[in-house]
Amino acid sequence: MKTLLLTLVVVTIVCLDLGYTLTCVTGKSIGGISTEECAAGQKICFKKWTKMGPKLYDVSRGCTATCPKADEYGCVKCCKTDRCNK
């Protein structure tokens, strides 16, 4: 009986994936990029392009709770898997 209970607990933990933290690429195109684990409640990675001039875009990346809006001449990509915003 104890073995069955222990097995059920292990299966539950594996299936629920308790403690999972999303990892996103963060930083700006100018200052360099790295990866970081997102804070609680931030379950989305984003990559945002902001037009700075003809054929010139500033790119920022990071974690967020909601997908940010694109600027008038920019673009945003949001995703929910590790390092999906490369």
From Swiss-Prot:
Cellular component per GO, a single term: extracellular region
Organism of this sequence: Dendroaspis angusticeps
Disulfide bonds: C24-C45, C38-C63, C67-C78, C79-C84
Primary location class: secreted
Localization per Swiss-Prot or TrEMBL: Secreted
InterPro entries listed in its UniProt record: Snake_3FTx (IPR003571), Snake_toxin-like_sf (IPR045860), Snake_toxin_con_site (IPR018354), Toxin_cobra-type (IPR054131)
Stretch forming the signal peptide: 1-21
Tissue localization of expression: Expressed by the venom gland.
Pfam families: Toxin_cobra-type
Keyword Zinc-finger attached: no
UniProt-listed SUPFAM superfamilies: Snake toxin-like
Protein name as annotated: Synergistic-like venom protein
Keyword Signal carried by entry: yes
Any one GO molecular function term: toxin activity
Keywords: Disulfide bond, Secreted, Signal, Toxin
Family stated for the protein in its record: Belongs to the three-finger toxin family. Short-chain subfamily. Aminergic toxin sub-subfamily.
